[in-house]
């Protein structure tokens, strides 16, 4: 596919950029369609995204767009595509650009121009009577847009600032072919069925309340799931030579100034005043881990020190960005901070990567790796950053691991290796990270005494496996569609007495399972067995159902139905041994 670039040239697109350009052009065509249907609409931003495209629209007073209006907008978009309008591009000096946008009543574009650097190039793309300020590139003719669909509408503040006006965000998807679009729409339908918010309600895992937006409540079943995950985390970290610490939730502002968070992260932090002194609720665990290291002298013989922490952190997120467990304002982070000598660095990074790999294999996740380099807003010298990035590269190459470089996406204090999981729907989630930090040991004057009795500065590694525990739980819910493996399932077995005659026997069986350490529930309600089975399978999503009628009472055995709907008869002892083996091996 050829594209029109903002210098006026037309060139063949690299294959990996085709979808992005199609989506960007779809956003312009959607805006043109909306302008035809709602002539007084003003437009803010309309980019392509990893998942589709959107445009933020300011509609006239009293006018609203809902999903009911999508067929009309899509029909107008198809007209524009059929008209096969040519995309053209031109550049204007700042004054002329402002005049053009003012003449067309595009107040948001005028404000955006004012935010640009004085020497910024200002280019416009036009198709038919629609003009949009844009850097491109775009398709050459509207007919090149073959497959698109509008998918949702929501609110979004102008520039993401809650003090600004709330605009209407219209989302869509676009692909090169109808087959790709159909496949994507099927995936979206499947994603709706797997929505962790829906499954979380059905399985009594967690809830959200208006009284605490962005702060999840975990229910009893959710706590079983969460604690089972944490038990697994503690077991594998103990085996890998980690110790566990816990650091305070609230620490004074000076600590965060020393760490660099106050200068680089304060907009995301909550603060309070205690005894006339300003304190911050921690957004990250690392400064607390540094204070633990600094609390006593260290010898080179003690290193590496691997200190893990399941720490509760709080980060301010805009209310409109909150989304179930995926985007919250407080969460538990499975951090660990490693303090190492230079000669230990590569082996420690390799050890961390292998640990993270073992975790993701346990849950059946494929993943790819990115090396994220220095961002614009960062601290430290060029030399330190070069050393840090080289240290991560060396470890990845020693592992023989393929990776992509993600320029400018490192943490403010150091570069990082990011792990992007692929779930059962093919979606990717950034979870695990390994970050190399020369800055915090310098800022806090961390030291150890080397073999030659001189004081040296340790290198610090920050790393997480799950990332946010809450977010990882959300990912697991959708990955497994609530059908967790036996070891992880909040309810591992549900006993279903067919009638009152088998109720006592069902309770006897449950007692044996409970005594063996199996999580079992007895559904002894006076309901038809078919209803109980459907609920256990579709709502509770249990690994095993025990269907217990008069036949089982007489034989003293149980009928076991698994998720394949296959039913087999076995003794209670056989079943207990089977389930315990699955729990032990985390199969």
Regions found by a protein language model. Give the residues of each.
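NTP/phosphate- and nucleic-acid-binding module
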Residues: 1-42, 50, 56-587
């Amino acid at each position: 596919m050829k594209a029109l670039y903002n210098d006026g040239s037309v060139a063949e697109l690299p294959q990996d950029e085709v979808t992005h350009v199609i989506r960007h052009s779809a956003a312009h065509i959607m805006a043109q369609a909306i302008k035809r249907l709602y002539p007084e609409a003003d437009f803010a931003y309309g980019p392509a995204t990893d998942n589709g495209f959107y445009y933020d629209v300011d509609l006239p007073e009293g006018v609203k767009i809902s999903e009911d209006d999508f067929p009309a907008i899509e029909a107008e978009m198809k007209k524009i595509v059929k008209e096969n309008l040519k995309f053209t591009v031109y550049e204007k000096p700042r004054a002329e650009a402002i005049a053009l946008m003012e003449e067309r009543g595009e107040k948001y574009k005028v404000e955006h121009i004012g935010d640009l650097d004085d020497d910024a190039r200002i280019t416009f793309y036009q198709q038919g009577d629609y003009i949009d300020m844009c850097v491109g590139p775009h398709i050459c003719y509207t007919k090149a847009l073959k497959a698109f669909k509008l998918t949702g509408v929501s609110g979004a503040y102008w520039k993401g600032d809650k003090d600004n006006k709330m605009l209407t965000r219209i989302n869509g998807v676009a692909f090169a072919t109808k087959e790709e679009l159909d496949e994507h729409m099927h995936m979206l339908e499947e994603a709706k069925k797997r929505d962790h918010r829906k499954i979380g309600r059905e399985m009594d895992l967690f809830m959200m309340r208006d009284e605490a937006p962005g702060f999840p409540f975990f229910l009893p079943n959710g706590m079983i799931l969460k604690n089972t995950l944490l038990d697994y985390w503690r077991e594998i970290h103990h085996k890998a030579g980690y110790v566990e610490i816990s650091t305070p939730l609230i620490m004074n502002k000076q600590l965060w100034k020393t760490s660099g968070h106050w200068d680089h992260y304060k907009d995301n932090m909550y603060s309070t005043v205690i005894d006339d002194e300003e304190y911050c609720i921690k957004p990250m665990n690392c400064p607390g881990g540094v204070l633990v290291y600094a609390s006593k002298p260290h010898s080179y013989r003690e290193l590496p020190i691997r200190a893990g922490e399941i720490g509760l952190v709080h980060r301010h997120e805009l209310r409109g960005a909150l989304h179930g467990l995926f985007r919250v304002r407080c969460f538990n982070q499975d951090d660990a901070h490693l303090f190492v000598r230079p000669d230990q660095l590569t082996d420690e990074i390799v050890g961390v990567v292998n640990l993270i790999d073992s975790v993701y294999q346990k849950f059946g996740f494929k993943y790819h790796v990115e090396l994220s380099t220095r961002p614009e807003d960062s601290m430290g010298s060029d030399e330190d950053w070069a050393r840090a990035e080289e240290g991560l590269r060396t470890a990845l190459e020693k592992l023989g691991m393929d990776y992509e470089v993600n320029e400018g996406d490192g943490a403010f204090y150091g570069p990082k290796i990011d792990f992007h999981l692929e779930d059962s729907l093919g979606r990717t989630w950034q979870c695990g990270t390994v970050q190399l930090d020369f800055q915090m040991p310098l800022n806090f004057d961390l030291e150890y005494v080397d073999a030659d009795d001189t004081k040296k500065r340790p290198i610090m590694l920050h790393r997480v496996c799950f990332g946010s525990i809450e977010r990882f739980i959300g990912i697991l819910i959708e990955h497994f569609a609530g059908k967790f493996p036996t070891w992880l399932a909040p309810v591992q077995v549900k006993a279903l007495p067919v009638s009152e005659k088998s109720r006592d026997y069902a309770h006897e069986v449950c007692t044996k399972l409970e005594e063996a350490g199996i999580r079992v529930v007895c559904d002894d309600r006076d309901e038809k067995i078919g209803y109980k089975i459907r609920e256990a399978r579709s709502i509770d999503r249990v690994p095993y159902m025990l269907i217990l009628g008069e036949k089982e009472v007489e034989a003293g055995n149980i009928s076991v139905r698994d998720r394949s709907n296959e039913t087999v008869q076995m003794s209670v002892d056989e079943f207990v041994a089977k389930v315990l083996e699955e729990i032990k091996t985390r199969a």
